[in-house]
């Protein structure tokens, strides 16, 4: 009597791949089928096949080699802000930079910050160091790498205005310095996303100023944002990019989008360009809400709003 061959399920294949990667980068956190809802500010998202936090550059390069060997796509995430992960999750490998990629070195004309450095902390620390310029990013969640990729900013400026150069880990595994031309900054756009590179560090141009003046400006901007945006809600930040000459939030507010709801996904009653998870929202609900808000602006004003939130996964 012959024994039927064991059937290796897709989930088991993922577990085996994760175990192999874990052996190659000892000490790093490697998880199979990790829910991305735990790692996004929306608190939404199905499982990543493999979720990994490499401890250093050598391990990060090894992750990239492993991905190439196995033909796996790689998605690098920062703090998980500005990100909507599908309910079916993300195939391949999701990389989140560990705290060892968060180093900061103060310079005479600015700062050299690791790609994993928290933007909010960098804003505060730059003020204490008497270096001004980052105040325009007050209240924006996420990491330096994520902020560079989307050219994060507010109505007072964008981080791309400050970037002198950045060190990138390219898909090939090579490390290269990118200048302002390669970064190609425009409103909520950079050359980083299309190139599929990982931001290792960035040099930002700042200017000296009295710390007390910077602290006062930071506090004014923080209070302004807290007064009109749902900063404590589960959100991914601004949903749509501002069209030329008008704020997306104003368009949606006038169109009557505030409070609009699909299941547990809702347009904030505080700011119409912020979508919030009321508790157990699914990505499908959030996507339907996005479509409805977009259709409303198009129908009422003929404005074709462009999504600012990045949607990934299945």
Segments (PLM) and residue ranges:
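Short polybasic amphipathic segments
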Residues: 102-104, 164-168
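Anion-binding (especially nucleotide phosphate/pyrophosphate-binding) glycine-rich loop
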Residues: 10, 14-144, 152-154
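Short loop/turn motifs at secondary-structure junctions and domain boundaries
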Residues: 158-160
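Short, basic and Ser/Thr-rich N-terminal targeting/leader segments
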Residues: 70, 77-79, 162, 233-234, ...
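Beta-strand secondary-structure signal
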Residues: 51, 112, 165-167, 201-203
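Phosphate/pyrophosphate- and phosphate-bearing ligand-binding catalytic cores of soluble enzymes
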Residues: 2-6, 31-32, 40, 83, ...
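Core subunits and conserved enzymes of cellular information-processing
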Residues: 127, 146-156, 176, 182, ...
């Amino acid at each position: 009597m012959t024994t039927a061959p064991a059937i290796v399920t897709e989930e088991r294949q993922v577990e085996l791949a994760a175990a192999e990667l874990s052996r190659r980068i000892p000490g790093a956190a490697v998880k199979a089928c990790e829910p991305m809802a735990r790692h996004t500010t929306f608190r939404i998202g199905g499982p990543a096949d493999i979720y990994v936090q490499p401890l250093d550059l050598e391990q990060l390069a090894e992750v990239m080699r492993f991905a190439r060997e196995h033909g796996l796509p790689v998605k690098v995430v920062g703090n998980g802000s500005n990100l909507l992960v599908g309910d079916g999750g993300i195939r391949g490998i999701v990389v989140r930079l560990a705290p060892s990629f968060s180093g900061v070195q103060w310079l005479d004309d600015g700062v050299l910050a690791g790609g994993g450095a928290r933007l909010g902390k960098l804003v505060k620390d730059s003020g204490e160091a008497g270096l001004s310029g980052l105040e325009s990013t007050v209240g924006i969640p996420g990491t330096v790498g994520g902020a560079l990729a989307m050219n994060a900013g507010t109505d007072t400026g964008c981080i791309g205005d400050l970037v002198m150069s950045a060190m990138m880990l390219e898909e090939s595994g090579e490390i290269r310095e990118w200048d302002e031309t390669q970064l190609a900054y425009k409103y909520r756009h950079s050359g980083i996303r299309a190139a599929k590179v990982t931001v290792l560090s960035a040099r930002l141009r700042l200017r000296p100023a009295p710390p007390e003046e910077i602290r006062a400006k930071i506090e004014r901007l923080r209070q302004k944002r807290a007064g009109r945006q749902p900063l404590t809600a589960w959100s991914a930040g601004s949903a749509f990019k501002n069209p030329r000459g008008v704020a997306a939030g104003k368009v949606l507010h006038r169109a009557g989008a505030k409070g609009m709801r699909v299941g547990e996904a809702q347009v904030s009653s505080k700011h119409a360009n912020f979508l919030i998870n009321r508790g157990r929202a699914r990505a499908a609900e959030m996507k339907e809400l996005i479509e409805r808000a977009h259709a409303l602006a198009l129908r009422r004003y003929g404005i074709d709003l462009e999504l600012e939130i990045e949607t990934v996964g299945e």
